[in-house]
Structures are given as C-alpha cells and as structure tokens.
From Swiss-Prot:
InterPro entries: PP2A_PR55, PP2A_PR55_CS, WD40/YVTN_repeat-like_dom_sf, WD40_repeat_dom_sf, WD40_rpt
Main function: The B regulatory subunit might modulate substrate selectivity and catalytic activity, and might also direct the localization of the catalytic enzyme to a particular subcellular compartment.
Signal peptide (residue range): none
WD-type repeats, residues: 22-61, 87-128, 171-209, 220-260, 279-317, 334-375, 410-446
Molecular-function GO term, any one: protein phosphatase regulator activity
Species per Swiss-Prot/TrEMBL record: Oryctolagus cuniculus (Rabbit)
Family: Belongs to the phosphatase 2A regulatory subunit B family.
Protein name: Serine/threonine-protein phosphatase 2A 55 kDa regulatory subunit B gamma isoform
Length: 447
C-alpha cells in the first residue's frame, strides 16, 4: 500500500499545544465524551485535565474546534500496599465518560487498582438575600432583622465543580488495563491481566467476576488479558483480547462466568514469518468496536486489523503501521520498545482508522480508498493553523528531500494514545507530555 501524498483529505490544522515539563505530566490516556464537546486527558501524576470546545464565533471563524482548559483535578494519589509491600502508582490508566443524563457530566478514571466515578457540574449563579445569614454566611443578630425578604439568585463567574461520587476498590489483584461502560448505562466492566469484573455504577462494595483465566498453577499461565470493551449496542456482549493475539467475544446471557467464549477470533500464524519475537509482536494492545457494532479494530505491534463479527477465521483488513521496523526487532527488544502498547481509533463513520507510531508519527488508513498517510505531531513541525504535511520513512535506496531514514527515528518519541471526535474530523494526539488537537478544515464533516 503506497502512502498518499494528497493533502486535500488530510488538511489538519494545528489548534493548540499544551506542553509540560516533568515525568508526572506525561499523558497516559485521552478520551472524548459522547458529544465531543469535552475532552479528558489523564497523566502519570494522577491528574485529569478536561478541555471544553469553544463555541463557534462569527467574529473568529478559526476558533471552531478549539479546546480550552475546562477543569483540572487530582484523581488519584500514590499509595502503598502494606500486605504486598508494593507501591501503587497514581498514573491514570484509562478514562471513560458516562452518557450524559442531566446537566452534569460524569466520568470514570482508574489507576492500577482503584476506579473512581466523578461528577462535573457548573455553577454560574449564587443565592443572595438570606434573612438569617449575612453575605459571608454568618448568622445575623436576630434583633437587627426587621423584615422578611425572598432570597434571589444572582449571576456569578462560572465555577466548575468536580466531586467524587463513588470509589470502586478492592476488585483487582492485578493491574487494571481497561474499563468500559455498558450501553445499559447502569453497569461497567474493568479488566486486569487475568480477570474481568462487572460493576454496577451505584454499588461500590461488590463486583461480579465474569472472566477468570487464572490457572490453578501459575506456572501453567500462557496468556494474559490485554484489553476489553462492551459492544456499543448489545449490553450482553463484550470482547477481550489476549497477549497471544486472539479475541474472545462473550455473551453474558450464556453463563454467569464467561469462561467459554461465544466466538474466538484468531489469525493463523504464517510459519515463514515465525521468529523469536512472533508472540511478542502479535500481542493485542487495544481493541475497539466500530460505532456500528459490526466490526472490531485491533492493534498489535506492527499492524492494525479490522475484524468482522461474522468471520472468526481471519481479519477482513490488515494495515501495516511500520513494517520497516521488522528488521529492527532485536534492538527494539533490548530497549523494551517492543512492549509499547499503542492504541487505535475509528472515525465517526468507521471509514478511517488511526493509530500511533514512533518519532511522533501517527498513521491514518482510509478503508474505502485504501490510501494511507503518515503525519507528525511535534512542536517543530506543527504551528497553530498550519497544514500538516505527510511524512515518509525511507528504508535505504533513494530518498526524497523530506524523507526520514528508518535509522533516524527517535524511539523515545512515541504516540501511544489517540482519540477521534465521535462526529467530526477532530483528533486528539498525546505525544509524551504534549497534547495536540488537529481538525480537518477541508472536510469538516466525517466522510
């Protein structure tokens, strides 16, 4: 598949760059809410930053799609497990928004062990004119109260309040790698290396174990759970991926403990490509249902694959993300990069998929035209409202002027976390400790 150098379809203009300095500020998750008006990021310091989309202004047409900081709060603190003598990092592993049901917004955030439910509310009015209290809230001297008055609401500067509503703890022995909210809007699941639990959003003291792959003897362990997600429309269906590259679709109507999957999606290994690294690079790092619910998107180290729920034998589409790294797997193993967990994302119409790579590159694949493009998210190449130019990695041979050699790639600059606006061509890219937001100015609607 050749790279598409036609920039008309991928004319993403850079909107905003929020740069930070320390290790704690490295972004560890990015998530749009269901309308795309809010964007949440979590970092290694346990903080959650919420950005809100600016309303479109007639005076400033370029402001459409820009996001400003809406609220920042500390979600998790570092803890210590005294029974196991283990430190529990404050790093936010995942954020998931709940569908909005009233004026408030709600989201779930999790670190390795504890999931928290947060409520985000706005206040732009305050009551004034109490009979028994003064403006500072102190009780008045009753002898000075000579008349009754009706308290009134007076406008005030907008205040965003974030409050913890629930804390879901003690549900996991191993590190939580994913959470997913069910379409019934009442339950969600959380997955660690060996188990998946089902929680009710209103109940914090118990959860139901729906998948348990822990063997009686841990020496017999051959695979771990890497990601899981509920089906977007059928509340009884969910999928989980494994370190062996397989996907298991489970139906909660079949049994309380879904140890027996309904469908197993697995691609037979090509014996000619077998190597020491085969199992490592086949491990699925992310799985996402399409918005339609018909397909699943998975990411392993070198590829992204699209699976049809009706065909278990093999993926219907396979896209090479950075196949030029296949010859460098040995050095990538030595520096631990081979264990990096890249995420993937669908656009709103399920026609384009996106995933990250090294050197601050990210890749887009158009499923209809079969075109693909490599773009770069970096402070050097991205200035506000500039058009992103396609990049090309060269493996030996002739090089064009803007090509970059595979030997020049910076493996410390990696894009692991990406998100796509649910209805528009706006994408959020986390590049280490910088957040980039790009918008397609040519095609403002999802094609």
């Amino acid at each position: 598949m050749g790279e598409d150098t036609d920039t008309r379809k991928i004319n993403h203009s850079f909107l905003r760059d929020h740069s930070y300095v320390t290790e704690a500020d490295i972004i560890s998750t990015v998530e749009f809410n269901h309308t795309g008006e809010l964007l949440a990021t979590g970092d290694k310091g346990g903080r959650v930053v919420i950005f809100q989309r600016e309303p479109e202004s007639k005076n400033a047409p370029h402001s459409q799609g820009e996001y400003d900081v809406y609220s920042t709060f500390q979600s998790h603190e570092p803890e210590f497990d005294y029974l196991k003598s283990l430190e529990i990092e404050e790093k936010i592993n995942k954020i998931k928004w709940l569908p909005q049901q009233n004026a408030a917004h709600s989201l779930l955030s999790t670190n390795d062990k504890t999931i928290k439910l947060w409520k985000i509310t706005e206040r732009d009015k305050r009551p004034e004119g109490y009979n028994l209290k003064d403006e500072e809230g102190k009780l008045k001297d009753l002898s000075t109260v000579t008349s009754l008055q009706v308290p009134v609401l007076k406008p005030m500067d907008l205040m965003v309040e974030v409050s913890p509503r629930r804390i879901f703890a003690n549900g996991h022995t191993y590190h939580i790698n994913s959470i997913s909210v069910n379409s019934d809007c009442e339950t969600y699941m959380s997955a660690d290396d060996l188990r998946i639990n089902l929680w009710h959003l209103a109940v914090t003291d118990r959860s139901f174990n729906i998948v348990d792959i822990k063997p009686a003897n841990m020496e017999d362990l051959t695979e771990v759970i890497t990601a899981s997600e509920f089906h977007p429309h059928h509340c009884n269906l969910f999928v989980y991926s494994s370190s062996k590259g397989s996907l298991r679709l489970c139906d909660m109507r079949a049994a309380a403990l879904c140890d027996k999957h309904s469908k197993l999606f697995e691609e037979p290994e090509d014996p000619s490509n077998r190597s020491f690294f085969s199992e490592i690079i086949s491990s699925v790092s992310d799985v996402k249902f399409s918005h339609s619910g018909r397909y699943m998107l998975t990411r392993d180290y070198l590829t992204v694959k699209v699976w049809d729920l009706n065909m278990e034998a093999r993926p219907i589409e396979t896209y090479q993300v950075h196949d030029y790294l296949r010859s460098k797997l040995c050095s990538l193993y030595e520096n631990d990069c081979i264990f990096d967990k890249f995420e993937c994302a669908w656009n709103g119409s399920d026609s384009v998929i996106m995933t990250g790579a090294y050197n601050n590159f990210f890749r887009m694949f158009d499923r209809n035209t079969k075109r693909d493009v490599t773009l770069e998210a970096s402070r050097e190449s991205s200035k506000p409202r500039a058009v992103l130019k396609p990049r090309r990695v060269c493996v030996g041979g002739k090089r064009r002027r803007d090509d970059i050699s595979v030997d020049s790639l910076d493996f410390t600059k990696k894009i692991l976390h990406t998100a796509w606006h649910p209805a528009e061509n706006i994408i959020a890219i986390a590049a280490t400790n910088n957040l980039y937001i790009f918008q397609d100015k040519v095609n403002s609607d999802v094609h």
